[in-house]
Amino acid sequence: AYDPDPYKRYSAEHTFFLL
């Protein structure tokens, strides 16, 4: 989840965590 946009990175991290 190495996205230049911190919000998108945060969202991705939580999405994978919830999965």
Swiss-Prot record:
The UniProt keywords, alphabetically, are: Fibrinogenolytic toxin, Fibrinolytic toxin, Hemostasis impairing toxin, Hydrolase, Metal-binding, Metalloprotease, Platelet aggregation inhibiting toxin, Protease, Secreted, Toxin, Zinc
| Entry's Gene Ontology BP terms | proteolysis; venom-mediated disruption of extracellular matrix in another organism; venom-mediated fibrinolysis; venom-mediated hemorrhage in another organism
Hey, what tissues is this thing expressed in?
A: Expressed by the venom gland.
Name the EC number(s). Answer: 3.4.24.-
- CC cofactor note: Binds 3 Zn(2+) ions per subunit.
Q: What is its main location?
A: secreted
Record-level Gene Ontology MF annotations: metalloendopeptidase activity; metallopeptidase activity; toxin activity; zinc ion binding
Thermal dependence reads:
Optimum temperature is 37 degrees Celsius.
What pH dependence of activity is documented?
Optimum pH is 7.6.
Q: Which cofactor does it need?
A: Zn(2+)
One GO term of the cellular component aspect? Answer: extracellular region
Compartments, record wording = Secreted
Q: Which family does the record assign?
A: Belongs to the venom metalloproteinase (M12B) family.
Could you tell me what this protein does? Zinc metalloproteinase that causes hemorrhage in mice following intradermal injection and impairs hemostasis in its prey. In skin tissues, it degrades components of the basement membrane surrounding blood vessels and capillaries. In muscle tissue, it degrades the extracellular matrix, thus causing muscle necrosis. However, it lacks direct toxicity on myocytes. Hydrolyzes alpha-2 chain (COL4A2) of type IV collagen more slowly than the alpha-1 chain (COL4A1). Hydrolyzes fibronectin (FN1). It also impairs hemostasis by acting on fibrin(ogen) and platelets.
Protein name per Swiss-Prot or TrEMBL: Zinc metalloproteinase partitagin
Which organism does this record belong to?
A: Hippasa partita (Funnel-web spider)
